[in-house]
Amino acid sequence: MPRIGTTVKMIVAGVLLCIGGPALVQYVRPTEEELFQKFNPELQKRNLETRDQRQKDFDSFVTQLKTHAKSDKSIWHAIKESETTNRREVETRRKAELEEAERQKAQIRKELAEGS
């Protein structure tokens, strides 16, 4: 069995590593404000302009993940299904817009033909 002095040294070294290491990392790591101040002014301006949009995108992503997580299916299958339904909705919307444009063109042609 090792001597008491060696055991105490090892315990002190372990505590120093387990507590001192994360404390040192926390002390050395810059805050978000410090990082932001190190950006050049153009990047700061662009970051401030897009902050709201990025926050909205992140919030919608998180809510989407929460709804997919509530599903009985695997999250990957749920996301894939939602992507396919989104594609279908976009396709139907695009088709409806094209049909509306064609209908308006036909109406304009009809009005021009009647006016002549």
Curated annotation (Swiss-Prot):
Residues 76-116 are annotated as: Disordered. It comes from the Eukaryota. Residues 79-116 form a coiled coil. One of its GO terms (biological process) is mitochondrial respiratory chain complex III assembly. It is a single-pass membrane protein. Its main location: mitochondrion. The chain crosses the membrane at residues 11-27. The keyword Coiled coil applies. Keywords: Chaperone, Coiled coil, Membrane, Mitochondrion, Mitochondrion inner membrane, Transmembrane, Transmembrane helix. It holds the Pfam family CBP4. It is found in: Mitochondrion inner membrane. Essential for the assembly of ubiquinol-cytochrome c reductase. It has a direct effect on the correct occurrence of the Rieske protein, core 4, core 5 and apocytochrome b. Belongs to the CBP4 family. This is Assembly factor CBP4.
